[in-house]
């Protein structure tokens, strides 16, 4: 039994043997053929994938580029206008907020929550960005385990290729670009250094003048 639900112009129009899909909106999941257990709500949500499984795309163009060549349990979740809109073969990403992770392509295991969070990266893996503009400049052009964590408005917002950083607090580590292995906890902590490494700053404006 199929248990598919489709509402909207050409929603799920290509499904052949896929099951348990919920597709709501014009062209939502319109390329799915054998993909199963997907939820796509919004125009063109999950609109290119034909064999992917277990995805949630809620919002205009969410996961619209995802497309696996073989049946794959990808476990991607994207919610918000354009969230994850460039993901092609990345797996296990959670992208919530308008344009969150919207440049990611084949990156894996990322969490981006907030407008534009992790919005420039294409191939970085295993980063957590929570807050408007958090890690929104990070961009690895080859598959890289970045292990950056940024929580707070603009936290780590200038990081490009730095790795192993933890920024907790609004604007913490805000101008870091390539610095690595730093910890900044507190609003404005370590917010002027650009390339330093192995520093720990805890408290409001801690190490704010280090550069």
Predicted regions and their residues:
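Glycine- and small/polar-enriched repetitive beta-structure motifs of secreted/surface proteins
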Residues: 1-211
